[in-house]
Design a protein with these regions (language model features):
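Active-site loop/oxyanion-hole signature of alpha/beta-hydrolase fold enzymes
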Residues: 12-15, 56-99
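Conserved serine/cysteine hydrolase catalytic core
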Residues: 190-229
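Alpha/beta-hydrolase fold catalytic core
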Residues: 1-30, 51-54, 92-94, 129
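Active-site signature of alpha/beta-hydrolase-fold catalytic machinery across serine-
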Residues: 45, 110-114
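Gly/Ala-rich beta-loop-alpha elbow adjacent to hydrolase catalytic centers
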Residues: 100, 104, 108
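Helix-loop "lid/cap" segments that line or gate small-molecule binding pockets
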Residues: 150-155, 165-176, 186, 205-208
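Flexible "cap/lid" loop of the alpha/beta hydrolase fold
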Residues: 113, 120-159
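Conserved HGGG/HGGXW glycine-rich cap/lid loop of the alpha/beta-hydrolase fold
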Residues: 18-68
Length: 229
C-alpha cells in the first residue's frame, strides 16, 4: 500500500462513507475518526508511524468525500454510530481499535460503548465526550437548534476563488497553514471557476439535545476497554 494510502468506500443504510486506508492489510484494524469539519487526511501524518496496523481513516458523514445526510437528518455525535457499526461488520475483523480526534473522539467513545468487547483499544486525541450540558439549558438549546436550521435554508455555501483563500480562512480560525493545506484536497470541490466547501453546512448548527453530566459519567463507567487519552 502506498504512502499516500488507498481510497476506500463503504455503503451502509444508503449512505456512502469514503476514506483512506494505510498500512498493513493483515495488521490489527484501526478505525480512525476525524475532528469537526476535518476529513480523513488529518491522519496522513500519523499513518507512517502506524505502518504495522491496518489504518482505515473515514470521512464522517457530511464531510470530506462522504455523503451528506438526508434533508430531514441531523448531525448529533451519535448519528454516525449505526453506520460505523455497519462498516466494522463489512471489514469483518474480530476486534477493532477505535481512534478519534476532537469531535471524532466523542464519537469514538460512543462507538466503543456500542462495540463492547469487540473494541480492543480506544485512543482519544485532543477530545473526549463534550462538555456536559445543564438540564435547565435544554429548552434554550433545543430552540437554538431550530433557529439555526431555519436560518440555514437561505444561507449560501462558502465559495473560494482559489485554494489559498480556503487556507487563509482556516488560519484565521486558529488552524495552522500546514494543516489547512493538508486537508484541502478533501475539504474543497470545484465550483463556478473556484471552489466550495464539501462539508454539509448543517454541521455548523447547534445540536438539539446534549448529554448531561450524569449521562457522560454513565458512558465512561460502561467502558472497560484499554484507553489512551
Amino acid at each position: 500500500m502506498s504512502d499516500s494510502g488507498q481510497e476506500c468506500a463503504f455503503v451502509v443504510d444508503g449512505l456512502t462513507y469514503r476514506g483512506i486506508e494505510w498500512g498493513n492489510p493483515e495488521g490489527p484494524l484501526i478505525i480512525a475518526l476525524h475532528g469537526w469539519l476535518d476529513n480523513a487526511l488529518s491522519f496522513s501524518v500519523l499513518a507512517p508511524h502506524l505502518a504495522q496496523f491496518r489504518l482505515v481513516a473515514l470521512d464522517l458523514s457530511g464531510q470530506g468525500h462522504s455523503d451528506h445526510r438526508s434533508a430531514d437528518a441531523t448531525y448529533h455525535i451519535w448519528d454516525d454510530v449505526p453506520q460505523l457499526l455497519g462498516i466494522v461488520e463489512q471489514l469483518d475483523e474480530g476486534s477493532v481499535i477505535v481512534m478519534g480526534h476532537s469531535r471524532g473522539a466523542a464519537i469514538a467513545v460512543l462507538l466503543a460503548a456500542a462495540l463492547g468487547d469487540r473494541c480492543s483499544h480506544l485512543v482519544l486525541l485532543d477530545g473526549m465526550l463534550p462538555i456536559p450540558a445543564e438540564e435547565t439549558a435544554a429548552p434554550q438549546q433545543f430552540v437554538q437548534a431550530q433557529r439555526d436550521r431555519e436560518a440555514a435554508r437561505t444561507r449560501r455555501r462558502r465559495h473560494f476563488t482559489d485554494v489559498a483563500g480556503f487556507i487563509n480562512a482556516r488560519v484565521k480560525l486558529g488552524f495552522s497553514e500546514s494543516s489547512a493545506r493538508l486537508l484541502a484536497p478533501r475539504a474543497l470541490r470545484p465550483h463556478d471557476n473556484g471552489f466550495e466547501l464539501t462539508h454539509d453546512p448543517r454541521l455548523n448548527q447547534a445540536s438539539a439535545v446534549k448529554l448531561t453530566a450524569g449521562m457522560i459519567a454513565a458512558f465512561y463507567a460502561s467502558l472497560s476497554v484499554k484507553t489512551l487519552v
